[in-house]
């Protein structure tokens, strides 16, 4: 730790200790960027990524430098123009700072970092040359391959064909809509999971536009895509069970989707060999209540085994402590912004792996609009009770360190969502999504 030499006014002067230099500080001295937008994505996001890496359970100092350099060299150039008030903007569905959302995973084996981003083109901002932001996803994955990141490109290509807009479909939408005024035009996002020095890639795809053109509900397009990719029928049982449930909760026609309070919003999958891949179907529910959590957690009573019900009991405890405001949310018109009240709905995902008979569920609790520190103190107490002693002791101070220049007793937008899942083997598994 460096020491700032004190001015010796008297013998009682106490040395002042400077903050220890971090990998972010060191890299900031030597990294240069091609424009102010890239510079801003480094200045605004990299400090938090650096702190999350420092807090992670399995990142050596060398791996911290590795992941920050990868972000600077291979992710920032893909993020497009940084959002500036008064300039034409593009609504990334993630709702973080610009086109990226960091998140922190908590499990008994330790904490780890993930970030999700939408590769964004200048043409998507203007709404002219790339109105649905379709082209940058190919560039992003090509860049990752050149950088040595391993993933399954064939799975991406298969899903792209099934869910993303073709040139003809994009042109058809442009002929009938004022595209720049459309709230959400996203096609795909990429998530990068950091495991020590390794990186794994997930793909998120948004079905709304293509499903509308095909005149089928979102959930039907998503399940059809999984079935098309699943040539050997390894996901047949789980997708059939999920379809049976979704038919009871989601609209069955495109016309009904405009007023639906529950519907599928996107799907995700690991870009690995199909035998190891997990498909996840995400839905939201505008009715925020624990009764709705019970319905979706158990798939309307279809999931009623001991592990499912044990997880539900722990989730109930967490829900009661957090005191998330209940009620019906308005339809989502834009990502959350600083100063918003509790506007976000509940989210759930249903995970399916090859050979699974039934999906596994994860719940996402909306925290936007609630002061940060009360949430942090409740989470710290929860961590202590459920086998996360280090996180229980440190989380409040750690969160303050993530956002050192803000009054977290008042600020309400940084801890945006808390996801929760449960298994007999690992116990609670949680992720906090930071905006």
From Swiss-Prot:
GO terms for molecular function: prenyltransferase activity. Prenyltransferase; part of the gene cluster that mediates the biosynthesis of the benzazepine alkaloid nanangelenin A which contains an unprecedented 3,4-dihydro-1-benzazepine-2,5-dione-N-prenyl-N-acetoxy-anthranilamide scaffold. The first step of nanangelenin biosynthesis is catalyzed by the indoleamine 2,3-dioxygenase nanC which produces N-formyl-kynurenine through the catabolism of tryptophan. The two-module NRPS nanA then utilizes anthranilate (Ant) and L-kynurenine (L-Kyn) to assemble the dipeptide product nanangelenin B. Signal peptide: none annotated. GO terms for biological process: alkaloid metabolic process. This is Prenyltransferase nanD. Transmembrane segments: none annotated. Belongs to the tryptophan dimethylallyltransferase family. The keyword Protease does not apply. Substrate binds at residues 101, 206. It holds the Pfam family Trp_DMAT. Keywords: Prenyltransferase, Transferase. Pathway: Secondary metabolite biosynthesis. Its EC number is 2.5.1.-. It comes from Aspergillus nanangensis.
